[in-house]
Amino acid sequence: MLSGESEMDEERMDLGIEFETTEEIPVPERLIDQVIGQDHAVEVIKTAAKQRRHVLLIGEPGTGKSMLGQAMAELLPTEELEDILVFPNPEDENMPRIKTVPAGQGRKIVEEYRRKAKEQEGVRFYLLFFVFFIVAMAVFLSHGDPNTLLLGVFVILVALMVTANMRFKTQAMVPKLLVDNSGRKRAPFVDATGAHAGALLGDVRHDPFQCFSGEEVIIVEKGKDRKVVKLREFVEDALKEPSGEGMDGDIKVTYKDLRGEDVRILTKDGFVKLLYVNKREGKQKLRKIVNLDKDYWLAVTPDHKVFTSEGLKEAGEITEKDEIIRVPLVILDGPKIASTYGEDGKFDDYIRWKKYYEKTGNGYKRAAKELNIKESTLRWWTQGAKPNSLKMIEELEKLNLLPLTSEDSRLEKVAIILGALFSDGNIDRNFNTLSFISSERKAIERFVETLKELFGEFNYEIRDNHESLGKSILFRTWDRRIIRFFVALGAPVGNKTKVKLELPWWIKLKPSLFLAFMDGLYSGDGSVPRFARYEEGIKFNGTFEIAQLTDDVEKKLPFFEEIAWYLSFFGIKAKVRVDKTGDKYKVRLIFSQSIDNVLNFLEFIPISLSPAKREKFLREVESYLAAVPESSLAGRIEELREHFNRIKKGERRSFIETWEVVNVTYNVTTETGNLLANGLFVKNSGGLGTPAHLRVEPGMIHRAHKGVLFIDEIATLSLKMQQSLLTAMQEKKFPITGQSELSSGAMVRTEPVPCDFILVAAGNLDTIEKMHPALRSRIRGYGYEVYMRTTMPDTPENRRKLVQFVAQEVKKDGRIPHFTRDAVEEIVREAQRRAGRKGHLTLRLRDLGGVVRAAGDIAVRKGKKYVTREDVLEALKLAKPLEKQLADWYIERKKEYQVIRVEGGEIGRVNGLAIIGEQSGIVLPIEAIVAPAASKEEGKIIVTGKLGEIAKEAVLNVSAIIKRYKGEDISKYDIHVQFLQTYEGVEGDSASISVATAVISALEEIPVRQDVAMTGSLSVRGEVLPVGGVTPKIEAAIEAGIKTVIIPKSNEKDVFLSPDKRKKIKIIPVERIDEVLEVALVESEKKRELIKRVRESLPLWMEETPSGETLHEHKGGATLPLEESKA
């Protein structure tokens, strides 16, 4: 047995530093000092930063390549940083000019040009005024002569055209800041891993096809007037007097030029000027996306770009992992409350006076003159009176309900109440009472509970409603805070049969708000379908709808049509129908009664405000599903039941994608090329009249100017992109042009744009083969190539570095507690185990960091102040790699079906050991049989199982051993070797001794012990050579219930097992194949004869001991006597 093998030191481990917790460990400020174990790479990076050399980092994932790239950026000087501007070119508009200035100057230059443009606006105004004045004087002096009047009109028109053109030219002359380095405290670090051509090399925008559905909400400012409008309504209104129209293939485009008007649209950075609006008519496809986890939805053409947390992405590429940038919007503020009192002006006056009074302290008389407000009003305010609306605003502010933003977590509760008010709720015209009627007392109670969560305790009454035809319960409150709050948020006021219903704009900002609104609306007005059997099959009967009466169809129809459109995002089919009922109209939102639509509805609309209605609905669906086996849907019963069970558990899909073909789309073009639609930050068209230089977008190579460009897996870039990258590295400049041949951006090509970056490329050994030879030559000739180490010596100094690593990970994560000393010891032991070599520590620190974070999460869950050893041990069990989980499942499954056997002996069957991934072992059963050769010329070794090239060659090498000891021609045999159920694949030669043992057992018909497993490579001389992953292989054998493991003598010091595992296994190191057979074969006379023959056949030096025993000495290794008792 392996004596003293890889023993874990139970005594206090020398960590190179004394501490109680990692709180005491200082974490270096500079990233370069945080790099662990890669001393050679650190020195190279420091030299490369000083000399501005490129670096190629080759190594396994998780060894710190990207960290070294970021560290280099810290080492570069910031004094050399520059801003890059792009200017229009009067001589050739498709070749914008490029200018570089010291960092921080770019913004000043752009602001200066904008100031000049505004001055030009003033000149334009005075010029027009002068022309009007001259024309007016001429007409006056000519006593109204018609010819003079006609000439004057002509002069005015010409002046308007000239000044409008002058305005556009002054705006077009404002440069665009491509790269802004103002305020930077370190050189740029740009990670271009996986970037496409446009993102890496720069692009020129052209997106006239990128359009919206038109249902989106935008915020528009015209002069001092600011309002929330639907995009479709805004564009249609602007196109009442279009500037022009044309055809784009089969699509008719109508547009309006608004450059001469003072219209602005809200974007992420405030309001920006609107340039154009356009409408496109013709068949077009919209991609509709709902992400409930990240709470956003959008409906745009597939190539429409949106801003995600990872940069710009086309809508067609958006996945459930993408987070679209959202900007919080103010939904409710003081002025909106004031408007419910009709005190908009008075509220504004009070705020103006209050600021004036706090600043000057002047009395009301003087203030009245300076502010143009009535003296009597100011006298009352000076004495402490306030507008009624202000008192209400102050009360709502105490409840933190003002200002109310789109990110407020209470909005869903507000939305569900609002939905109920749109159904069976009411606010009277005088704003005196708010009421809600339901036949279900529980619904009333939930309505009240929700209001209390928002407003606290308030006065109300609940009583039987004797005015209704059926039995119902009435809730009523007179609380003016509640009434004014919901009126300001868009609740209908007065008799709903006479009121025009409009879906409040803020409800459309997020899918969660819309679903909450629908919950309240359906809980009040919705009807539940009934299950019924018919001769032709089963179906839902009765009504499944929301219906309301009105005296004017247009007061309800658009409201329900809009709801139906938004429901389609979730795959819920609904249509609107209007029926005449006496002197009124009944507008009905009718839902499809197919089982799929019913389940979709229940999945997303929980009907939480009306528990009885939900229970009734679920019972009807259960009755339907119970009858499905007898219907045409019998083949889908499991699918439908599974969907229904998820609904009952409250589960729902988080990412829903649908497509819709529409005939009209809408868009707007702003000065900055972006806007907020439904609160989401999106790009918009830059193609219609936008100057070429404003459509230029810098690439990552330009943003990395004077900094570091990091590209991991650089070989994944196309050869064309690698060639372009090489050109940029050589020239230190690279022009920007449109990357798409179909785009008008392809006609634009800027002057060369500076891109003097240091390239830090990374990858694995395969990267070298796939890299463009010239690119690698450039790096090698003008920089360094570094191989990243995967282990470092296990010394106290390096253990101290791992202590620092743990402290760094805790600080970097920011959400886990610090580690105690014994917990750090366990992390170091895990680093020893993962190194796979005695006396070494792993440098795959990303994986080790995963253990640190998992242990920290466990400590947080337990409410601990510090992470302890027990937390780390639990983390190692909980956070197993995927390969380890597969290996455990593999072993469990194989044992269950007796594919892995751990008792008795069998001929030709051996338990080999293999590795999945990097750190996970599996037991690999191997079987061999010998049969007469099928070919008269020669026998074959036939191997089955999913083997790699190296594994196949290793099997063939076994035949050399067999031929030598057998002493006869084995060509008359076919030897079949099967790797049982190796669907996961096998590569490497570590199964060589297992194959040799199985084949020899089959040839000699000697059973192999099934409680023995083995791993090791085999040379043609019979030597057992070292292999990798010995520790995880032994652990797999232990988990499978095997008692003895054979390993190469060379790997003896690489075994690292915990004490509890050491007790469960006997480990035997060997140097030769005869030693393997000695242990593995079942004891018999045939075995003794076989081993003697094998030993005699091995090309090894022999000698006799004084006692007469024959020894085989193998290069100074262990010696095994030939004795009968050896087993």
Curated annotation (Swiss-Prot):
Residues 167-1127 are extracellular. One of its GO terms (biological process) is intron homing. GO terms for molecular function: ATP binding; ATP-dependent peptidase activity; endonuclease activity; serine-type endopeptidase activity. It is a multi-pass membrane protein. It is found in: Cell membrane. The chain crosses the membrane at residues 125-145, 146-166. The keyword Transmembrane applies. This protein undergoes a protein self splicing that involves a post-translational excision of the intervening region (intein) followed by peptide ligation. GO terms for cellular component: plasma membrane. The active site is at S990, K1033. Its EC number is 3.4.21.-. Keywords: ATP-binding, Autocatalytic cleavage, Cell membrane, Endonuclease, Hydrolase, Intron homing, Membrane, Nuclease, Nucleotide-binding, Protease, Protein splicing, Serine protease, Transmembrane, Transmembrane helix. The keyword Iron does not apply. SMART domains: HintC, HintN. Residues 904-1083 form the Lon proteolytic domain. Residues 1103-1127 are annotated as: Disordered. ATP binds at G59, E60, P61, G62, T63, G64, K65, S66. Residues 1-124 are cytoplasmic. NCBIfam families: intein_Nterm, lon_rel. Homohexamer. Organized in a ring with a central cavity. This is Archaeal Lon protease. It comes from Pyrococcus horikoshii (strain ATCC 700860 / DSM 12428 / JCM 9974 / NBRC 100139 / OT-3).
